[in-house]
Amino acid sequence: MTKLIIHLVSDSSVQTAKYTANSALAQFTSVKPKLYHWPMIRNLELLNEVLSKIEYKHGIVLYTIADQELRKTLTKFCYELKIPCISVIGKIIKEMSVFSGIEIEKEQNYNYKFDKTYFDTLNAIDYAIRHDDGQMLNELSEADIILIGPSRTSKTPTSVFLAYNGLKAANIPYVYNCPFPDFIEKDIDQLVVGLVINPNRLIEIREARLNLLQINENKSYTDFNIVQKECLEVRKICDQRNWPVIDVSTRSIEETAALIMRIYYNRKNKYNK
């Protein structure tokens, strides 16, 4: 496989550059990437340390840096080394400025903007944690999204991922032969999404979990017939109420969350017309 070195340079957490790089790398199956992360680069001293690393290991540079002088230093250095140096959001900012007729602000402020979006995200994360695994069902009316599904169908990480996108998500497990919360009999406004998975895949995940916890007694947890019935019952519950169902067998958490968000915003846009 072809090796590819990528330096991610940022004056903050480097996540924007990282997500961009990984999205691009997904298009190259024959590439073996090596990503170097350089976060919180906010002065020339720190940047010079990074430049020495880049000089030692040549590769593509992706950056998100607000300070103009630091950007100039970085791009000039890469130009002299004849290596690509790409601003992840530079072109986007420029096009926004041209289209809107608004000048790019010259003053740079490294303090995070504690706006409504920031606090909405914090509240959503807190909500996801407090309403994980069927907890505090009396507060489901506060949720934007409710996830239901058998154990180990990625309900918790999906809820947290949704929370990082500002959406309050509660999740409720479905356990075979156990009564399901009576909220499903009520007319609710929240988006309810069922998560199911291929039974064989779910058994593999559950067995790995039990081995990790060194538990051998819970045979029904990995019994194929029971696992299959759990998934079928979740589908039945959702189908009867016109709730969407997502099969997570081959989906990453990010993909599952993205699909849920698409359903959520399509639904919201429809009702807001």
Swiss-Prot record:
List its EC numbers: 2.7.11.32, 2.7.4.27
Q: What class of enzyme is it?
A: transferase
Q: Which reaction does it catalyse?
A: N(tele)-phospho-L-histidyl/L-threonyl-[pyruvate, phosphate dikinase] + ADP = N(tele)-phospho-L-histidyl/O-phospho-L-threonyl-[pyruvate, phosphate dikinase] + AMP + H(+); N(tele)-phospho-L-histidyl/O-phospho-L-threonyl-[pyruvate, phosphate dikinase] + phosphate + H(+) = N(tele)-phospho-L-histidyl/L-threonyl-[pyruvate, phosphate dikinase] + diphosphate
Superkingdom is Bacteria
Record-linked InterPro entries: Kinase-pyrophosphorylase, PPDK_reg
Amino acids binding ADP = 149-156
Which GO terms of the molecular function aspect are on file? ADP binding; ATP binding; phosphotransferase activity, phosphate group as acceptor; protein serine/threonine kinase activity
Instruction: Tell me the first and last residues of the signal peptide.
Output: none
Keyword annotations: Kinase, Nucleotide-binding, Serine/threonine-protein kinase, Transferase
PANTHER family xref list: PYRUVATE, PHOSPHATE DIKINASE REGULATORY PROTEIN 1, CHLOROPLASTIC
What the protein does comes down to: Bifunctional serine/threonine kinase and phosphorylase involved in the regulation of the pyruvate, phosphate dikinase (PPDK) by catalyzing its phosphorylation/dephosphorylation.
Specify the protein name: Putative pyruvate, phosphate dikinase regulatory protein
Provide the species name: Rickettsia conorii (strain ATCC VR-613 / Malish 7)
